[in-house]
């Protein structure tokens, strides 16, 4: 009888019961290679240094725009330019690889369609009722959606945004009282309260978040913010600008915003953005690059 109970207990165990809790870094290259390695592999360094060799690229021009720090029991959410989302437990990824390995093709992990690519990657520990997703498109449309609407996801993923010919470029997690910041390729930015975006269902479209001054301008970065921390903006020529969020006044959604980086031949167009939690330390966060 004792052996029967032991077999029943073993059958009731889930894989997550067997997996240790480890802090890892998840990277996804623009070329579509994803990998996880232990966070202890990296160390903090000073600005201007040579750095340490990271993910090996399979071709010239590939970059790593998406980075997340996660626990192995967290869930990864992959959002695509078509507005679909796929989920994966971190411990389901291949075992930790070396810092210089190229990783695994993301198409081997999630069911991407033809010409579909991942444009945002976030991690969650649970689908909290009071947490929202803030989604931003290439043309500046925004959408706010309750995170629990992503429950019961299967391998086919879920449609989260009615886009038409637009593309989803950024997804962030937000609480009820946080602000949204959007930055464009021409150096404009806008900050507005997230509660100016009415929560909608998965199949709904978006509303205007920022009004572009030219038809050539596109969104390159978005995140949720408050008065603490800094916004780092980087141009294509590697020039960066770090500004405290307290200097970005909150505006009404849908305006043209303010100039955050004067685009010149010396800076190049805005390529990326990131949040700095202090003047010296960047927060690990995905960035949307349109190079």
In which residue ranges do the predicted regions lie?
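Hydrophobic core positions in small helical hairpin nucleic-acid-binding modules
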Residues: 3-122, 128
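Short beta-strand elements that form the blades of beta-propeller/WD-repeat-like
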Residues: 25-27, 75-78, 132-135, 231-233, ...
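Nucleotide-binding motor/catalytic cores of P-loop/tubulin-like NTPases across gene-expression machines
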Residues: 43-57, 250-269, 282
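Conserved structured catalytic cores and adjacent interaction surfaces
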Residues: 125-258, 267-279
């Amino acid at each position: 009888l004792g052996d029967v109970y032991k077999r029943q207990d073993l059958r009731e165990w889930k894989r997550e019961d067997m997996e240790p809790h480890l802090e890892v870094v998840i990277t996804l290259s623009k070329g579509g290679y994803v990998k996880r390695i232990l966070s202890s592999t990296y160390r903090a360094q000073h600005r201007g240094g040579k750095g340490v060799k990271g993910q090996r690229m399979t071709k010239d021009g590939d970059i790593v725009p998406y980075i997340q720090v996660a626990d192995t029991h967290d869930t990864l959410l992959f959002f695509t330019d078509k507005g679909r989302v796929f989920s994966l437990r971190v411990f389901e990824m291949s075992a930790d690889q070396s810092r210089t390995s190229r990783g695994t093709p993301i198409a081997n992990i999630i069911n991407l369609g033809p010409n579909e690519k991942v444009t945002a990657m976030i991690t969650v520990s649970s689908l909290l009722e009071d947490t929202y997703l803030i989604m931003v498109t290439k043309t500046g449309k925004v959408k706010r959606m309750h995170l629990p609407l992503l429950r019961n996801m299967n391998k086919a993923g879920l449609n989260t945004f009615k886009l038409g010919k637009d593309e989803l470029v950024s997804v962030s997690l937000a609480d009820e009282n946080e602000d949204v910041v959007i930055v464009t390729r021409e150096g404009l930015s806008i900050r507005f309260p997230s509660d100016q975006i009415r929560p909608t269902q998965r199949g709904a479209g978006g509303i205007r978040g920022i009004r572009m001054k030219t038809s050539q301008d596109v969104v390159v970065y978005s995140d949720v913010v408050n008065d603490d921390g800094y916004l780092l903006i980087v141009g294509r020529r590697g020039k960066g600008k770090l500004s405290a969020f307290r200097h970005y006044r909150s505006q009404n959604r849908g305006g043209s915003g303010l100039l955050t980086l004067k685009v010149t031949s010396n800076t190049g167009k805005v390529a990326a953005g990131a949040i700095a939690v202090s003047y010296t330390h960047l927060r690990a966060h995905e960035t949307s690059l349109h190079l």
